[in-house]
């Protein structure tokens, strides 16, 4: 097992990184091969093309049971560790995608391995309770040690779920209940409401809506899919709701050269948000809430300014709409702050905030006023998993103890600077470099070139992800450090130099 392997410590020299850029040269860094993290490998090791023969055979077998066309390769998770993912053919790759941004502190972290092995934790991993009715004795303590210790400003209430989609789906329900409760006032449910809700009719099922943005991704369940607008294949053939969809800013880069253009673009989008709220109120499909990602991820790593989000928050407040921030992909530290919305600098950033991925469990925080008025209104069998809360508490301890948020900010600056250097050297392949922390991306000329670059990088020992129509995104772990950035930049510079 990887976590039983003898740990290693190789200390980085203090020599400054050396960047050499001449016409036609490749990115060179003397720091690229340095290792300073005790359970990491020292670099990629490739034995076959990926997917290799064993992966291909397993893909054929899986395809007899389900559609396996999305599978990239099969993994050996016992041998994977740190920032490196090992496949079943023995290929060791620097993983900058980290299970679609869901691995917080690397593979097989020794502290988590130790936690799993402790006898007092065995029952937590063996028994999965129905938390809504039969929680374990230590459930409250573990919530306080884990999720409540990083609760966003103004949100003292928490409901745990299993994934990002069910987190947003139930957040929508919470918003609808809150909005109807405001309209209803102190009186209870009427007989008509109780009867009509059973046949999907108003007033029991009011025609409320959630406003979302083009390019957004909020999940694949029915309500979430109505607010997801990133790829047609996610939505085709699925019935949906008549809910408003606003344009999300499409910023021009470099930002400092297009300040006025980008301000006008954001103003246009905000104006459309207000127009849609008014329009849907007149259509009797009142906008009960607005959902937005701090950075549109699946839709192409689309950014907006902090000022845009502050003004959007004001619009929600002005029109009495709940403001739901989807931190499923941006949360957990990858932007250099624990929650990406902290960059906005607001004392009242949101009414509801959803999370998952790096948080190891799903769920949403919310203000006291959004608390469901009765049991079973927001409910399912498991309501998350106590074992994930146990692991998350240790992850948060490690983030604090090892100052990983500052590490993300520093490593992210190294990565972003290197990408900007590559953009200057290979503008025909790399454009619109952007990012916050290690949450970085760039555009390629088209989808075909993007996909080819990702495949070549994988065969060179680097796992990358795509997003949007033609973007490459970076989603490394929080233990991704400067030397990992330099290692990637050296490899990718060589790929670009040879690309045809």
UniProtKB/Swiss-Prot annotation:
Pfam families in alphabetical order: Aminotran_3
Taxonomic placement: Eukaryota, Metazoa, Chordata, Craniata, Vertebrata
This protein's name: 4-aminobutyrate aminotransferase, mitochondrial
Keyword Iron-sulfur among UniProt keywords: yes
Cellular localisation: Mitochondrion matrix
Gene3D superfamilies: Aspartate Aminotransferase, domain 1 (3.90.1150.10), Type I PLP-dependent aspartate aminotransferase-like (Major domain) (3.40.640.10)
The family this protein is said to belong to: Belongs to the class-III pyridoxal-phosphate-dependent aminotransferase family.
Reaction catalysed by this enzyme: 4-aminobutanoate + 2-oxoglutarate = succinate semialdehyde + L-glutamate; (S)-3-amino-2-methylpropanoate + 2-oxoglutarate = 2-methyl-3-oxopropanoate + L-glutamate
